[in-house]
Structures are given as C-alpha cells and as structure tokens.
Amino acid sequence: MKIDSFLLKKYLIPLGQKDFIFYCFKRILYNRETDSTILQNNTYSELMTLKTLSNFKPYNSTTKDFSDSADLAADIPGYAVPLNALLKLKSVNRNVDNSRFLNKLLFTAYSFFDEIDTIKQLMYEQYTFQGNNIKNRSSDSVLVDNQLAIPKILKEAESHKVIMINESHYDWRHRYFMTLLLDSLFKKGYKYLCMEDLENEKAINKRKFPTSDDGYYIKEPFMANLARTALHIGYKLIEYEDTTNDIDAYLFNSPVDKREYYQALNLYRQYKKDTTSKWLIYAGYSHINKLRFSLVESSTMAKYFSEFSHVDPYSINQTAYCDIFNTKVAFDSFQNRENYYYLRKNQIDDSTLLKQSDLYIINNIHNIPYEKPDTSKSVQEYHIVYNRKKNEKASYVEVFLKDEYFQNYHAVPIYIKKFSGNILNKNVWLPKNNYNMIVRDESDKIIFQSDLQ
C-alpha cells in the first residue's frame, strides 16, 4: 500500500499500535519494525531524504540508521554514483558491526564493473577464510583436467525435468557459465529460465533485451547478457521473487523461511502450467540447497519446490568452492586450461555438502572473455579509445548494442570498464554487431559518445 508522507506523519504514526511496519519507495528498500513513538518525530524527515537521492550525503542528520543510509546509497540509479556513495560511507564508518553489511553492498557495486580482484581484496581485508576440504590435494592443487563441467551437466540434463544452478551475486564467471549452457540445454527441452530478482517479466519477454528497470542484479553486463542470450535462443524468462511483503509474516519461522516458501510457490505455480517442458532455475547461494539454508535456517527454496511439485531438482552449486570465498582451491596450472570443472564426490570431504547439492563446480577462469583475442567467425575486434580532457572526471566507459540503446536508454551495456588513468586504450572482441560507446563521469552523466569502431 502506498502511504502519503502527510498521512504517515499525521495519522498512522500517532494513532498506530506500538509495533508496525512501513515501506518506502515504489518498491521496498527496507522493512523496519519498530516502536511508533520513536518514529513519530523522525519519519517525515527520513522520507524527505528518500525523495532527494541526488543530494545523498552519508550520515545525513535525517537518516540516522546506518543500514538505511547504505541501502539508499546502493539503490541510487547508475553505476558510479552508488559506488562512490558507498565508499563515502565506508570512509566515515568506525563501527565494526556495520562493516559486514556495508561490504556486501560494496561487493555488488564493484561487481557491476566486473572487478573480482577488488572484491577479493575487500573480502580478505575483513575475513579469514577456511575453505572446504578437498581430498587428494597435492600442494593445494585440484586435479580435474578430465572433469569438464559442461559435458557432465548436459548428460545429467537428459534425465531431469528441473535444474537449479546457483551463483555468487559478485561473480560474473558464474553468469558466463550459465550462458554457455543455454543453447545446448534448450535443444534438450529446457524452455524456461527463472531468474532471481527479475522484474517486469512481461515487458522483458516482449522487448527481447534487458534494461536496468528489470531488476537489481541485471544491471551487471554478464547477468544482462544471460537474459539477452536466453531470449535470443527462445527461452521464456520467469520472475519468482517473493513480493508479498510482510502481510502474513507471522505464519513463518523467519523472514528467510517466508522468502524461500514464496519463491518456491511462485516457481511451482509457473511450472504446473507446463510440466512437459524442462525448466532452468537460476538463484543465489543457498536457495538451491536440498538440506538446509544455513546452520540456523532449515528451509530452502529447493526443498519447498520439491514438496509442492514432487520433482527432485538437479542442484548445481557454483559458490561452495568459489575462489572469492575459498582460498583452499587451487589448480595445477600445468594440467588445467581455463575452463569450468566439477568435483567428484570422493573429492569432497564434507558429508553435509554431499547432501546439499548434486554437483559442485569450480572454475579456472581469470580473464573476461571479451578481453581475450578471439578468431571465431562470429566475433570481431573493436577498439575502445578515449583520452581524458583537462579537469574532466571521466569515470568509466560503456559499450551498448546500438539497437538496444536507441530503443531504450535504460538498456544494459554489454561491456563496462572503469578508467584507471588518463587514457583508456583497449581492444575487445565482441559478437559482430553495431555498438555505441559512451563515456560517463563520476555523476553518471554522459560526457562523450560515438560508434564503436
């Protein structure tokens, strides 16, 4: 329910019960349950701050709660402005308890620029990771040269109706892997791609390309290209996020339990419309677990979906051994080329993991594909060249499919790169097409654009 700020201040808060929940924006930025007497004097000012994001200032006197400020910063449209706002928060934050929450938002903001190394550095600054044990490891090397993941998955796909694959929301390599699977799986009968956090399902299926209005994670180029490629092949994209707000929260053990339940229910309602086709479900982290979500949460989307549909999904896990979180996974570089591999069950020394998912993926990918020479007939070399002018604050360059961009200025770039000096001179290898190059400043304003040659 949309509540006018005047009504909220004058009527709902003074007359409300001790505890209530209020919502901000056209979609939920945060839910907060608190004592109405505390909010009475502060809420109106806070809502005014929500309406003036362009003037966002960390620790604004009207946004006293740190998490609210961080959420607001992360949700600002664009790429450079939200990242810079979060970095400002980080520079003034002295509270250890806030750091973990803030870093999660920073990881996502950096992921939009596909900066895995920066994310890893932030991770290592904050945590000491202890990776899962892998048997038969010699000098911390994993010998998986003959264990290529894609052929294994395609073989398993023949005998399953539903495949669930997870990702880290910070890792473009997981989205690229999913994209590599799409064409072959489509030929095996998989017709639907269900994506976490997807919005505007009807619009994107009709438009046939993604925009930044279609979800939060889809702003990242590889996630956008996953959706774009699926639509081009012939998949129908399905949204399944829980949008029930907190109307019936009392029925569930926790917010996690509620979200897992409704995600699964939304998937099942779609699935039962076409049980003859096969389905791909793409989700983050623990949603695809078959045993439990975490040490303290037993419910998962995969478990609920199985209960509703009586279908046992084939669960593929990319996060348990992801090198962003796990420092114990290393490859024998003399035997393994850049590729995606899977672990045999006798290589996993963790009985819980064996129950959580059916297959564990590790990747030996280090370079963004577009930045590597490619002699394929369908690929062409393009040149990105831009010299910063004096006193110019050029921040990053975007490359758009020209047709998409001029149909909708909210189209998502196929490639994005931050400036690291005064000159950006880079060759990229992209599918043959017409592209538009745009350079933006620190305020996400366009300062230069041209066709990409």
Q: Which residues fall in each region the model found?
A:
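Compositional signal for N-terminal targeting/processing segments
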Residues: 3-453
